[in-house]
Amino acid sequence: MPVDISSLLHAGYSNPLLREWQGVRPITKSSLMYPIFISEIDDAKEAIDSMPNQFRWGVNRLEEFLGPLVKKGLRSVILFGVIESKKDYCGSMADSENGPVIKAVKEIRHLFPELVVACDVCLCEYTDHGHCGLLYEDGTINNAKSVERIAEVSGNYALAGAQIISPSDCMDGRVKAIKQKLVELELSHKVCVISYSAKFASGFFGPFRAAANGAPKFGDRSCYQLPCNARGLAKRAILRDVREGADGIMVKPGTPYLDILAMASKLADDLPIATYQVSGEFAIIHAAAAAGVFELKRHVMETMDGFMRAGANIVLTYFTPELLEWLEY
């Protein structure tokens, strides 16, 4: 039976090296950013029940925790503060000198000067109402005051030594305000902004909110995080942040939004594109692997391939410790 020569594909991926050549750039250790939770208790190592192998770490234990990972090739981390007390209307502990993030930035920069430190910037972990910004009396978001406060926190993180500011609050105009604050502080030449541009009001955030003690006390975040089916709004949010001077763009969550990730890589093709494999994605994969549904390593690596194929340069994932091991070989 005659065969159309152009239909013969198997030979092109008939051995492992050829299969590598057929793919896009694979995930590397440099592509990984590890999200870590910093406790207000300096000596803490508190297990997070909903997130296997993840802990809230006190600043005094960061050397014990991060040292082995840095030796394995960890290049960057992103910090999330966790507090139980001293929450207030404006989230004053977010950038307090005695707060977990400021202390952790200084300690990590001292212990591991080669490690790139990013700070998530949001107020939900620190406000008494659990929302990501400041509120009017009727409980709605005061965008202008929120942006002012987010820029203030960002500036203080930069002064403490953070090299990357990552606002996740979803306020309109915050990238421009942060960039202006960095110019004012004469830090705009060495502190970059990777914005959570396309952050969706996702159910996959559940385990994180428990881990960071940052769930809203009333209502939800659907008026400032993007609707899950809103491709057009995501496009506008990405383009807005590019215009406002973002140095990188992030899509969050990861796996359910690969189409948005691919779109971001085209809309902002001259910027680094990040995606966040969030706590719910992490928990689902762990639970399925524990139940014998699939093999953990193979499935995690497949999700990494999906992110890179869709256009990511940076992947935030709680699987970073395992990936540092797997990518060694």
UniProtKB/Swiss-Prot annotation:
5-aminolevulinate 1 binds at R209, R221. One of its GO terms (biological process) is heme biosynthetic process. SMART domains: ALAD. GO terms for cellular component: cytosol; nucleus. Binds 1 zinc ion per monomer. It holds the Pfam family ALAD. The active site is at K199, K252. Pathway: Porphyrin-containing compound metabolism; protoporphyrin-IX biosynthesis; coproporphyrinogen-III from 5-aminolevulinate: step 1/4. InterPro entries: ALAD (IPR001731), ALAD_AS (IPR030656), Aldolase_TIM (IPR013785). It catalyses: 2 5-aminolevulinate = porphobilinogen + 2 H2O + H(+). This is Delta-aminolevulinic acid dehydratase. 5-aminolevulinate 2 binds at S279, Y318. Keywords: Heme biosynthesis, Lyase, Metal-binding, Porphyrin biosynthesis, Zinc. The keyword Lyase applies. NCBIfam families: PRK09283.1. Its EC number is 4.2.1.24. The keyword tRNA-binding does not apply. Its cofactor is Zn(2+). The gene is hem2. Homooctamer. GO terms for molecular function: porphobilinogen synthase activity; zinc ion binding. Belongs to the ALAD family. Catalyzes an early step in the biosynthesis of tetrapyrroles. Binds two molecules of 5-aminolevulinate per subunit, each at a distinct site, and catalyzes their condensation to form porphobilinogen. It comes from the Eukaryota.
